[in-house]
Amino acid sequence: MRSETCFDYSLYERFPTEKRPDSEVEELNRIWRAPKGWARLTAVNNNYVGFWYVVTAFGFFLAAGILALGMRVQLAAPMQDFLGVDTYNQFFTMHGTVMMFLFAVPMVDAIGIMLLPQMLAALDLPLPTLSAFAFWASFVGGTMFILSLFVGLVPVGGWFIYPPLTSLSFSPATHTDYWLLLIGYIELSAVARSI
C-alpha cells in the first residue's frame, strides 16, 4: 500500500528487524494525513510544501511576465510614453529580482523539497516545520516585494542593485533600503530551506 507521501512500505523489508505491527501503517498514515479545509495551510508535509512552492513560484513568474510585457510595450515603438524613465527602471529592477529570487531559486528548492525525501526513502525532510516556515517567509516577503510596486518603494538600481545606480546621486530615497530589507527576508527563507 502507498500513502499520500508516496513512501514505499516494501522498503521496510530491506532492514533486518522484527515483524512490524499490523496497525503501524495505518497509524503512520493517520499521523501524516494533511488537515482538512483551511487547516491544510498548516501542513508540514514535504509534498504540500513543495507544491505550494511551485504554485507560488509560478504566480511570481506571472507577475514578472507582466512586468516584462510592460517593458516590451514601452520599447515597441520609438518615443513611446507608456512608462516613464523611473517607472521603466523600476520595472526592470523588479522583473530581474522576481525572476531570480522568487521564481528560479524557489523552483529549484521546490524540486529538492519534493524529491529528496523520496530519493532517501524517508517520510519527510528532517525539519518539516522549518521547511513550512521557509515557505511562508518566502511567500510573505515576495508578496510585500510585489506590493512595493503599488506604494512606490521600488529602487531603480537594476537586477542586482548595481552600486553606481544605488548611490545617493541616482537613488536618493530609501527605496534601496526597502529592497535590501525584503531581499534579506526572502534570503532568510532560502537559508531555512537549505537547512
Regions found by a protein language model. Name each.
Residues 2-195:
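...captures the hydrophobic TM-helix bundle architecture rather than a specific catalytic motif
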